[in-house]
Amino acid sequence: MTNKTLMIQGTTSDAGKSTLVTAICRSLLRRGVKVAPFKPQNMALNSAVTVDGGEIGRAQAVQAQACGLQPHTDMNPVLLKPNTDIGAQVIIHGKARANMDAVAYHDYKRTAMQAVLESFQRLSSAYDAVLVEGAGSPAEINLRDRDIANMGFAEEVDCPVILVADIDRGGVFAHLVGTLALLSESEQRRVRGFVINRFRGDIALLEPGLRWLEEYTGKPVLGVLPYLNGLHLEAEDALPRDSIVKSDATLKVIAPALPRISNHTDFDPLRLHPQVDFQFIGPGQSPPPADLIILPGSKSVRNDLQWLRENGWEEVIRKHLRYGGRVIGICGGYQMLGRSIADPHGLEGVAGESVGLGWLDIATTLEPEKQLRRVEGRLWLDDARITGYEIHAGVTRCLASQTSAVCLEDGRLDGVVSDDNQVLGLYLHGLFESPQALTALLRWAGLNEVQRLDYDALREADINRLADVVDQYLNWEEIAGFLQVGPNSDDRESRA
């Protein structure tokens, strides 16, 4: 069995795989272990730009931070970005290869597995330990053939597996026992133990169930992790479910929950800011009065633009601007605010051209080569420093002289501001993570005395909080044994 590799699989989506990998990675780093995260295949519309100029799932970028590393395409060699109900853009080693439906991708999996193994071998050679995250559940019978995301990968590289389940949803013992029962005998042997996630209450009441589980399966419970309130690491793909109650929120910000929304993690700093009341507005919901409307990124811009119109957002924005409100469009939202969006190659569906909302004098054409950059620059507001990343296939040209939103360090200009200073559009994702930019943009939107928020520092604190929890509640002797690292090693300086 492969030394120094441990795979975390879950009984369901959102069982806690990403969070557990993040926590263990940081705990290992604090013990002086050189560790890297790895997810063979990810399906997500939230992605991050890597140091080598590709894109990976955002969860792996957070895990890289937990390891003290810059994100790299080897950490997530296969990324699937859904762009229709039956198809997705297939990204291999950070670069888009093709749009495929489910049948075509199934036939492509052998090629995808080669990319997975190449990346895994590079990480294994470079690091003391590799923490692997599975996808969804390993017990999806219809997905087992040619599986590269869960047990198919674990069997190929011969690594141990921990199975995690979410007790907060109920049925945790059925999830664990049922998942185990649907695995092959060799896969069952590969599962070394269980972790129960999001437990609330008195552990004494759970202990009879834990004893039964261990006796019934012959496998140990390696830890019961408590439910953590106020943990705000980026969600893998689903929009955040938990609202944040704030007593001092005075700025109302809303955004449409587009069917193909991408990189909704852009809004996390707004959700966490104590003075901002942020809300996603779904279909059938009436948008409330707001100070700021933000149009998010989209993996299918023309279709989401049509959805906006069908759900009355064009009139909502028109009225909002008439009463002095502000509007921001990010990436696909920026393109929607222009005069037209052309897709001559059919990159996001049927080839054609759509009339934009018309509040910015720009026109966009979608081109096959995707732009992937991590960037820094200065906002037109107060010369505020801004950092972010670009992930887009659109080439946008200005149809009239307009104020540029950002001057980038490489000399390029990004985005435009309307002549009346009410509408801003730009390609930069992550624009609210920079404290200076966040303060300047909130002030522009109408908030006078802005409290400073350092989103990266909050994320770092959350990662350390997770590591503290697994240090306390996981069986580290067993974990160290799986990874062939010393259970008691501890780099004290790395904690400082």
Swiss-Prot record:
Organism: Hahella chejuensis (strain KCTC 2396)
Gene responsible for this protein: cobQ
Pfam families: CbiA, GATase_3
Residues at the active site: 331, 429
GO MF assignments: ABC-type vitamin B12 transporter activity; catalytic activity
Record keywords: Cobalamin biosynthesis, Glutamine amidotransferase
Biological pathway: Cofactor biosynthesis; adenosylcobalamin biosynthesis
BP terms from Gene Ontology: cobalamin biosynthetic process
Role noted for this protein: Catalyzes amidations at positions B, D, E, and G on adenosylcobyrinic A,C-diamide. NH(2) groups are provided by glutamine, and one molecule of ATP is hydrogenolyzed for each amidation.
InterPro entries with a match to the protein in the record: Class_I_gatase-like, CobQ/CobB/MinD/ParA_Nub-bd_dom, CobQ_GATase1, CobQ_N, CobQ_synth, GATase_3, P-loop_NTPase
Domain of life assignment: Bacteria
Domain GATase cobBQ-type positions: 250-437
CDD domains registered for this protein in UniProt: CobQ_N, GATase1_CobQ
Family of this protein: Belongs to the CobB/CobQ family. CobQ subfamily.
Record's protein name: Cobyric acid synthase
